[in-house]
Amino acid sequence: MTCRSGFMVAMLMALLVAVPAKVQAGGPDGIWLTQAGDAKVRVSKCGGGICGVVVWLKDPIDPATGKPQIDDKNSNPALARRPIIGLSLFAGMRPAGAGKWSGQIYNADDGKTYASSIAVAGPDTLKVEGCVGGFCGGETWSRTTR
Protein backbone atom coordinates (compact mmCIF):
# COMPACT_ATOMS: atom_id res chain seq x y z
CA MET A 1 0.00 0.00 0.00
CA THR A 2 1.47 3.33 -1.00
CA CYS A 3 1.39 6.32 1.25
CA ARG A 4 -1.17 7.97 -1.00
CA SER A 5 -3.58 4.99 -1.00
CA GLY A 6 -3.18 4.68 2.77
CA PHE A 7 -4.14 8.34 3.06
CA MET A 8 -7.20 7.79 0.84
CA VAL A 9 -8.34 4.83 2.95
CA ALA A 10 -7.93 6.91 6.10
CA MET A 11 -9.93 9.77 4.55
CA LEU A 12 -12.74 7.42 3.48
CA MET A 13 -12.91 5.93 6.96
CA ALA A 14 -13.06 9.41 8.50
CA LEU A 15 -15.89 10.41 6.16
CA LEU A 16 -17.88 7.28 6.95
CA VAL A 17 -17.56 7.88 10.67
CA ALA A 18 -18.56 11.54 10.23
CA VAL A 19 -21.85 10.77 8.45
CA PRO A 20 -24.70 11.67 10.81
CA ALA A 21 -26.29 8.68 12.56
CA LYS A 22 -29.69 9.69 11.17
CA VAL A 23 -28.44 9.19 7.60
CA GLN A 24 -26.42 6.07 8.44
CA ALA A 25 -29.27 4.35 10.19
CA GLY A 26 -31.99 4.35 7.56
CA GLY A 27 -33.70 1.89 9.88
CA PRO A 28 -36.80 2.11 11.99
CA ASP A 29 -35.08 3.01 15.26
CA GLY A 30 -36.11 6.43 16.50
CA ILE A 31 -39.13 8.53 17.35
CA TRP A 32 -41.90 8.80 14.77
CA LEU A 33 -44.77 11.27 14.50
CA THR A 34 -48.00 9.66 13.33
CA GLN A 35 -49.61 10.96 10.15
CA ALA A 36 -52.33 12.76 12.13
CA GLY A 37 -49.65 14.43 14.27
CA ASP A 38 -51.39 13.40 17.46
CA ALA A 39 -48.86 10.88 18.81
CA LYS A 40 -45.17 10.03 18.80
CA VAL A 41 -44.01 6.42 18.86
CA ARG A 42 -40.54 5.25 19.85
CA VAL A 43 -39.52 2.36 17.60
CA SER A 44 -36.58 0.24 18.73
CA LYS A 45 -35.09 -3.18 18.20
CA CYS A 46 -36.27 -5.79 20.66
CA GLY A 47 -35.77 -9.52 20.56
CA GLY A 48 -35.51 -10.48 16.91
CA GLY A 49 -37.83 -7.71 15.74
CA ILE A 50 -38.97 -4.19 16.58
CA CYS A 51 -41.13 -2.68 19.30
CA GLY A 52 -43.18 0.51 19.21
CA VAL A 53 -44.22 2.44 22.33
CA VAL A 54 -46.27 5.65 22.57
CA VAL A 55 -44.05 8.33 24.13
CA TRP A 56 -46.05 11.52 23.47
CA LEU A 57 -49.63 12.61 22.83
CA LYS A 58 -50.75 15.95 21.45
CA ASP A 59 -53.58 15.86 23.99
CA PRO A 60 -52.26 13.79 26.90
CA ILE A 61 -55.10 14.77 29.24
CA ASP A 62 -58.64 13.49 28.69
CA PRO A 63 -60.85 16.62 28.78
CA ALA A 64 -63.77 14.59 30.17
CA THR A 65 -61.86 13.35 33.22
CA GLY A 66 -58.96 15.77 33.59
CA LYS A 67 -56.69 12.72 33.87
CA PRO A 68 -54.14 11.16 31.48
CA GLN A 69 -55.62 9.48 28.39
CA ILE A 70 -56.27 5.77 28.93
CA ASP A 71 -56.94 2.82 26.64
CA ASP A 72 -60.70 3.11 27.19
CA LYS A 73 -61.67 1.69 23.79
CA ASN A 74 -60.13 -1.68 24.68
CA SER A 75 -62.82 -4.34 25.16
CA ASN A 76 -60.75 -6.07 27.85
CA PRO A 77 -61.61 -4.33 31.15
CA ALA A 78 -58.21 -5.22 32.60
CA LEU A 79 -56.48 -3.35 29.76
CA ALA A 80 -58.92 -0.46 29.35
CA ARG A 81 -57.45 1.45 32.30
CA ARG A 82 -53.82 1.46 31.16
CA PRO A 83 -52.36 4.83 30.12
CA ILE A 84 -51.84 5.51 26.41
CA ILE A 85 -48.41 7.01 27.04
CA GLY A 86 -46.18 3.99 27.51
CA LEU A 87 -48.55 1.71 25.58
CA SER A 88 -46.88 -0.92 23.40
CA LEU A 89 -48.38 -0.88 19.89
CA PHE A 90 -46.47 -3.68 18.11
CA ALA A 91 -46.73 -7.41 18.77
CA GLY A 92 -44.55 -10.02 17.08
CA MET A 93 -43.14 -7.48 14.62
CA ARG A 94 -40.48 -9.57 12.85
CA PRO A 95 -38.27 -8.94 9.79
CA ALA A 96 -40.05 -9.57 6.47
CA GLY A 97 -37.36 -8.43 4.05
CA ALA A 98 -34.92 -5.54 3.80
CA GLY A 99 -36.34 -2.61 5.77
CA LYS A 100 -39.66 -4.41 6.30
CA TRP A 101 -41.39 -6.03 9.28
CA SER A 102 -44.68 -7.80 9.77
CA GLY A 103 -46.68 -8.69 12.84
CA GLN A 104 -49.57 -7.03 14.62
CA ILE A 105 -50.34 -3.45 15.54
CA TYR A 106 -52.70 -2.19 18.22
CA ASN A 107 -54.96 0.77 17.37
CA ALA A 108 -55.91 2.63 20.54
CA ASP A 109 -58.47 4.67 18.56
CA ASP A 110 -60.73 1.62 18.29
CA GLY A 111 -59.20 -0.81 20.80
CA LYS A 112 -58.43 -3.44 18.17
CA THR A 113 -55.34 -5.30 16.99
CA TYR A 114 -54.65 -5.74 13.27
CA ALA A 115 -52.27 -7.70 11.05
CA SER A 116 -49.62 -5.16 10.13
CA SER A 117 -46.63 -4.43 7.97
CA ILE A 118 -44.10 -1.68 8.47
CA ALA A 119 -41.57 -0.51 5.89
CA VAL A 120 -38.82 2.09 5.91
CA ALA A 121 -39.64 4.28 2.91
CA GLY A 122 -36.74 6.71 3.34
CA PRO A 123 -34.44 7.98 6.09
CA ASP A 124 -37.30 9.96 7.65
CA THR A 125 -40.36 8.03 6.45
CA LEU A 126 -42.04 4.92 7.83
CA LYS A 127 -45.03 3.31 6.09
CA VAL A 128 -47.37 1.64 8.60
CA GLU A 129 -50.20 -0.57 7.35
CA GLY A 130 -52.91 -2.51 9.15
CA CYS A 131 -55.21 -5.09 7.60
CA VAL A 132 -58.43 -6.87 8.53
CA GLY A 133 -59.82 -9.44 6.14
CA GLY A 134 -58.78 -8.30 2.68
CA PHE A 135 -58.98 -4.61 3.51
CA CYS A 136 -55.86 -2.66 4.38
CA GLY A 137 -55.28 0.91 5.40
CA GLY A 138 -52.12 2.73 6.19
CA GLU A 139 -50.40 5.92 7.02
CA THR A 140 -46.99 7.51 6.78
CA TRP A 141 -45.06 8.34 9.94
CA SER A 142 -42.32 10.98 9.94
CA ARG A 143 -39.09 10.81 11.93
CA THR A 144 -39.01 13.43 14.65
CA THR A 145 -37.34 14.18 17.95
CA ARG A 146 -38.64 13.88 21.45
Description of each model-found segment:
Residues 26-40, 139-146:
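K/E-rich alpha-helical interaction surfaces of small helical-bundle regulatory domains
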Residues 46, 121-122:
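Structural motif
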Residues 9-18:
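Bacterial N-terminal signal peptides
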Residues 29, 35-109, 113-116:
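Central antiparallel beta-sheet cores of small beta-barrel/beta-sandwich binding domains
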Residues 108-110, 115-118, 125-139:
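Short, exposed beta-strand-loop hairpins at the edges of beta-sheets
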